[in-house]
């Protein structure tokens, strides 16, 4: 299993300034035998979870028959109905900083137990996650090996499913409408009165509590609120990484 714990990280450029490391996505290259084992474990997990109906219906990332398009269409239908009735909609777009890399292993394993995953399968997943080593490779040059203390490996076969299970209970903390695409969360409410704005702010507060409990960090700079309609948009706030309350940046769409 040692070879399965070794990964070469290749930085894949996303967008923005190329000299900013934050603008690169780390992708893990692992051994072929490890990927084969991951595929077998993933198939077993999916078959088991399908019998339980465990994955939230609000999750559209890495799910068969669901996609960015299904996520968008479900939302647009509700928003259009609200506009036809003469109401606006406030939509919160929430971003987690280095979400896949931040997943704490012990807490993930505890969550897996709540879904009925025990015994040898759980021990294999624990072995897969813990005592991993990585080094970064760029144009044939490599860094030294370092130990990975948290996260599910991006670019791996099993990593996305483990991440979905980790965030699977997030919708349970939210009163209003929510859709997820892996680590991207979208929460909205039809605004008929000030009480609806207040309810959406309460969801933000609940999301902050979930994040604190599970050691995930909201990226306040990338969180946005979009108001659909002609009425004024309310101000919403959340805690930044320093614990200070900051107002979420607004995008207005008429």
Specify the residue positions occupied by each region the protein language model found:
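Conserved pre-catalytic core of RNA-dependent polymerases
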Residues: 1-153, 189
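Short, charged alpha-helical motifs in flexible N/C-terminal segments and linkers
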Residues: 9, 20, 80-91, 208-227, ...
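Active-site palm subdomain of RNA-directed nucleic acid polymerases
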Residues: 41-59, 160-189
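Non-catalytic, peripheral interaction segments enriched in hydrophobic/basic residues
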Residues: 63, 181-184, 189, 209-235
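Hydrophobic alpha-helical membrane-association signature
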Residues: 75, 162-166, 200-203
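Catalytic palm subdomain of template-directed nucleic-acid polymerases
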Residues: 99-115, 185-212
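Short, conserved micro-motifs composed of acidic
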Residues: 140, 202, 217-252
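Short, conserved phosphate/pyrophosphate- and ester-handling motifs at nucleotide-, phospho-/glycolipid
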Residues: 155, 159
